[in-house]
């Protein structure tokens, strides 16, 4: 009976003695031996609540007890004892509440203990981050939308995420999973209605009917005002929970204890925001705890209670003139319907509108709870709205071109109590991406602080130039410090005041502590603390109501050419661009993997530039360098290096600026980094060198630090501007078998003299991949100068050629064929490689013959000639027939060399810089003879705009590769 009595549910308000008795009994019954670093694997009954007790303070414990009492209220007056399952559910909910307040992930802790109770072994889940993509389309989508189009967007986003992860975030490879949550198209009815209101809707043939007569900004406002909107939010919550439960049951989600991030597009972002806000309040948590769930720290909610008397009381008076939404929340007077015209009474659905008003109030119940606490006896009450809630806690929330700012502005107009201060989504951080020309998007920061309309949004770094970030700080505290004159008291610059703005400096001082708590708790760098300490007094008032510790508005690059497009076409273009944008994907990866705030120790010999982009750039050693490099683009390159296992390892790089190497980087620091363990993704800092007068550095890896057999990415980073050159160091065992391909001779099907892309011979990629699959090392060789490396590598990457070592001539040479022969001979003599097959044109026959290759191993693409018929094998029928012959006969076999060398199979990574090829100043010779197509003629304009370039002279689509540069003799370079 004593045991049953302990399990019985206490009456309301009697939770405190029950929990105190448990604590006392635990302290009495516990043994004298204490193990502070050990924790029981089995958490049963009362012990489950004590998990992590050392992380709580006394105030949290009192709040836990009050929360437990409220969790027990729905169980009745204690007429029946509480079952063990109900008790475990209460304990689980209590533990989740405590974790939310501490900003710890709530999944996995209690669930792991439950698995242990059942005797199931613990499994380590490889998924660390779950990205739930809420895809609702853009505001112009009609009907339910094409499911195949939504699935195609998710597939595109997943493929871009994988490529970027492989290229620059290898440590995250396989640990981030994307799941698709379809959302209803809530704007379809509004779009249909507004389209019928077009003044030219009766005349389809009229030219003006195709103009911009659709008020795009009104569509989301009409959509969220519909009484059916709450059903859409409930549907999204249900679908997200279903996807999450299926994920937990799958092989990728067993034992999952990572973070869950939400990504919402134009329409999905609206639904996701309301779902997050609703999940914070109505069920399970008290209003106080629910508002903390999405806040930065628990102390930030104190100002809400302090100012509610002045802010919300004034909102009661202001809301009298609006639609009768907040009247049901008044305590003093009953609800009175607004006087309406007689013609409106027959079509005005009062019940539906009241239900919708209750839904709006329930979303932000944490704000309006104090205003409505206990209605007067006999007074009207809003109907109960139950939409469910997320089964998971949201870590980061990313918005893609969402009109959420307009929606919140409308709601704040209708319900003045729903100001940015109180409306706090239940997540750690909100990121809102948008293009400045996107008619669907709007800013959010001016809603939280009106003065932010004078602060530009954060520019998302271009992935091609800064794949790991450009070093700018995203912290709100740093932004306030940078623009401190704007936020000083009395410098409002005619900005409208907030409803909850403090009336006097003493009130502002009450917000100082929450702001400091947020800055210190969210940032791991010393710069944020110093910035916060230097912030003005009013900064703490802003940080107390902010949705996270970082900036919220992020602007993506938007080319000026889009101004020529019709406005109604822009939502489709921009919506498609988010799923393909490597800028967005790289930014999300940096935030999710916390690459922005990693502390690097020089003693660990890690890469401060790669792993901590927030570090400031160093000044140039020479004053003239900054002047020389003005308005020129970096054209750095580092040679791929092949070294023998027991031989020297020499890294060579050249750092030039301008399209024709007009400026050399002289006398400046360059960091040399190598990824010694490619699977870990960690860059190791080898050394720092100074460039010579020609912009070159040569670094001989010391013997103690030489690398073993394998392929290692190498990066050379310029200290002054963080530009870099990428290459590979390959350490081979003796006798490694290779296959050589001449890029121009074997791959290019046309000679480009007009600036267009060289065509690829059909089947060429398949033949290269065939040799790679057999284990051979691929060598790409060309007589072109190394200044064209970025362009050639980007062309190979664009056509998915397998990964291999690429070798160029050292500058402009008189006889490129002789240079080829010398280079290959040195590889054979110094690195002890064996060439098993060689491909090229008729000009390469002499090169391969000098190396001693038999005719059976030389494959020439082109028409047979009697002169060379006995010196090579002509592939007159193309690569497709040749590949079939290789697979059918025994001409190709797996390599016989040392099995210690296992080459990674794959294509060229995204470190190639395709924007290098499309810049107009690189194509001066060809622009005068070839006019680009107008934007309207682009068959896939949305794809073309997904990765716009950072310079204004990239407005028109230019060829991705032009090889018509250099001396005239280069037209015949093999």
UniProtKB/Swiss-Prot annotation:
Keywords: Calcium, Cone-rod dystrophy, Disease variant, Lipid-binding, Membrane, Metal-binding, Phosphoprotein. One of its GO terms (biological process) is phosphatidylinositol biosynthetic process. The modification Phosphoserine is found at residues 30-31, 109, 295, 298, 321, 343, 495, 612, 907, 928, 946. InterPro entries: DDHD_dom, HAD-like_sf, HAD_sf, LNS2/PITP, PI_transfer. Residues 520-533 have a biased composition (Low complexity). GO terms for molecular function: calcium ion binding; lipid binding; phosphatidylinositol transfer activity; phospholipase activity; receptor tyrosine kinase binding. Residues 390-594 form the DDHD domain. GO terms for cellular component: cell body; cell projection; cytoplasm; cytosol; endomembrane system; membrane. It is found in: Endomembrane system. Residues 292-302 have a biased composition (Polar residues). Residues 284-304, 323-346, 491-536, 927-974 are annotated as: Disordered. Its main location: membrane. It is a peripheral membrane protein. Detected in brain and spleen, and at low levels in ovary. Belongs to the PtdIns transfer protein family. PI transfer class IIA subfamily. Interacts with PTK2B via its C-terminus. Catalyzes the transfer of phosphatidylinositol and phosphatidylcholine between membranes (in vitro). Binds calcium ions. It is linked to Cone-rod dystrophy 5: An inherited retinal dystrophy characterized by retinal pigment deposits visible on fundus examination, predominantly in the macular region, and initial loss of cone photoreceptors followed by rod degeneration. This leads to decreased visual acuity and sensitivity in the central visual field, followed by loss of peripheral vision. Severe loss of vision occurs earlier than in retinitis pigmentosa, due to cone photoreceptors degenerating at a higher rate than rod photoreceptors. This is Membrane-associated phosphatidylinositol transfer protein 3. It comes from Homo sapiens. The lineage of its organism: Eukaryota, Metazoa, Chordata, Craniata, Vertebrata.
């Amino acid at each position: 009976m004593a045991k049953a009595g302990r399990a019985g549910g206490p009456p309301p308000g009697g939770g405190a003695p029950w929990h105190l008795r448990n604590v006392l009994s635990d302290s009495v019954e516990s043994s004298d031996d204490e193990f502070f670093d050990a924790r029981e694997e089995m958490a049963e009954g009362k012990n489950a609540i004590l998990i992590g007790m050392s992380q709580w303070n006394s105030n949290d414990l009192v709040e836990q007890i009050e929360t437990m009492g409220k969790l027990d209220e729905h169980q009745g007056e204690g007429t029946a004892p509480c079952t063990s399952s109900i008790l475990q559910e209460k304990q689980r909910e209590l533990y989740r509440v405590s974790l939310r307040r501490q900003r710890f992930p709530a999944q996995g802790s209690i669930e792991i203990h439950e698995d242990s109770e059942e005797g199931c072994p613990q499994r380590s889940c490889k998924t660390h981050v779950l990205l739930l993509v809420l895809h609702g389309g853009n505001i112009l989508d009609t009907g339910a939308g094409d499911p195949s189009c939504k699935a195609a967007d998710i597939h595109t986003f997943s493929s871009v995420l994988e490529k970027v992860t492989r290229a620059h975030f290898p440590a995250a490879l396989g640990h981030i999973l994307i799941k698709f949550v379809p959302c209803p198209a809530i704007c379809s009815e509004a779009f249909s209605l507004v389209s019928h209101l077009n003044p030219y809707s009766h005349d389809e043939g009229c030219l003006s009917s195709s103009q911009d007569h659709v008020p795009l900004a009104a569509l989301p406002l009409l959509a969220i005002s519909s009484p059916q909107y709450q059903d859409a939010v409930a549907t999204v919550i249900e679908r997200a929970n279903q996807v999450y439960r299926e994920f937990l049951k799958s092989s990728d989600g067993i034992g999952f204890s990572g973070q869950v991030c939400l990504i919402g597009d134009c329409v999905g972002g609206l639904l996701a925001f309301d779902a997050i806000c609703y999940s914070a309040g109505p069920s399970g948590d008290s209003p106080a705890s629910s508002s903390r769930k999405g806040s930065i720290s628990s102390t930030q909610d104190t100002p809400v209670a302090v100012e509610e008397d002045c802010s919300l009381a004034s909102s009661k008076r202001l809301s009298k003139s609006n639609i009768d939404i907040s009247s049901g929340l008044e305590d003093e007077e009953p609800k009175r319907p607004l006087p309406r015209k007689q013609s409106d009474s027959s079509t005005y659905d009062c019940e539906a509108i009241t239900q919708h008003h209750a839904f709006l109030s329930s979303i932000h119940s944490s704000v309006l709870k104090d205003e409505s606490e206990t209605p007067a006896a006999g007074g009207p009450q809003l109907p109960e709205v139950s939409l469910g809630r997320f089964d998971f806690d949201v870590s980061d929330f990313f918005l893609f071109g969402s009109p959420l700012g307009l929606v919140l502005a409308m709601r704040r107009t209708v319900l003045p109590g729903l100001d940015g201060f109180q409306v706090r989504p239940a997540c750690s951080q909100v990121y809102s991406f948008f293009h400045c020309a996107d008619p669907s998007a709007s800013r959010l920061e001016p809603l939280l602080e009106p003065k932010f309309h004078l602060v530009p949004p954060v520019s998302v770094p271009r992935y091609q130039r800064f794949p790991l970030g450009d070093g700018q700080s995203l912290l709100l505290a740093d932004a306030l410090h940078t623009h401190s004159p704007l936020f000083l008291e009395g410098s409002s610059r005619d900005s409208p005041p907030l409803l909850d703005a403090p009336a006097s400096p003493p009130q502002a001082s009450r917000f100082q502590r929450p702001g400091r708590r947020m800055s210190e708790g969210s940032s791991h760098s010393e710069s944020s603390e110093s910035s916060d300490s230097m912030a003005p007094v009013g900064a703490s008032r802003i940080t107390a109501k902010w949705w996270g510790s970082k900036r919220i508005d992020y602007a993506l690059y938007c080319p000026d050419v889009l101004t020529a497009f019709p406005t109604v076409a822009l939502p489709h273009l921009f919506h498609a661009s988010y799923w393909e944008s490597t800028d967005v994907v790289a930014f999300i990866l940096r935030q999710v993997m916390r690459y922005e705030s990693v502390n690097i120790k020089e003693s660990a010999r890690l890469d401060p530039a790669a792993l901590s982009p927030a570090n400031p750039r160093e000044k140039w050693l020479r004053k003239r360098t900054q002047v020389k490099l003005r308005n020129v683009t970096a054209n750095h390159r580092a040679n791929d290096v092949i070294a023998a296992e027991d031989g020297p390892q020499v890294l060579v790089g050249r750092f030039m600026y301008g399209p024709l190497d007009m400026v050399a980087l002289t006398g400046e620091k360059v960091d040399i980094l190598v990824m010694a363990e490619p699977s870990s993704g960690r860059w190791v800092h080898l050394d720092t060198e100074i460039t010579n007068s020609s912009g070159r550095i040569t670094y001989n890896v010391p013997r103690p630090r030489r690398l073993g057999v394998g392929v290692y990415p190498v990066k050379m980073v310029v200290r002054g501007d963080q530009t870099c050159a990428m290459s590979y160091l390959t350490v081979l065992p003796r006798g490694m078998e290779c296959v050589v391909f001449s890029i121009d001779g074997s791959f290019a099907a046309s000679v480009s003299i007009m600036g267009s892309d060289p065509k690829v011979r059909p089947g060429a990629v398949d033949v290269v991949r065939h040799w790679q699959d057999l284990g051979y090392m691929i060598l790409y060789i060309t007589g072109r100068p190394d200044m064209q490396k970025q362009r050639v590598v980007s062309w190979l990457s664009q056509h998915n050629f397998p990964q291999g070592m690429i070798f160029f001539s050292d500058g402009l040479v008189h006889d490129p064929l002789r240079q080829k022969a010398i280079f290959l001979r040195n590889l054979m003599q110094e690195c002890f490689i064996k060439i098993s097959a060689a491909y090229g044109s008729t000009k390469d026959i002499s090169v391969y013959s000098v190396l001693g290759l038999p005719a059976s191993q030389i494959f020439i693409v082109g028409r047979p000639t009697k002169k060379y018929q006995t010196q090579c094998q002509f592939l007159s029928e193309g690569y497709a027939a040749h590949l079939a012959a290789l697979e059918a006969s025994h001409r190709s076999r797996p390599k016989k060399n040392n099995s210690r060398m296992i080459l990674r199979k794959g294509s060229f990574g995204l470190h190639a810089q395709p924007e290098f090829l499309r810049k107009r100043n690189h194509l001066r010779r060809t622009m005068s003879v070839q006019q680009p197509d107008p934007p309207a003629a682009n068959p896939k304009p949305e794809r073309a705009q997904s990765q716009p370039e950072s310079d204004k002279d990239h407005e028109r689509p230019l060829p991705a590769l032009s090889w018509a540069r250099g001396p005239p003799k280069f037209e015949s370079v093999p």
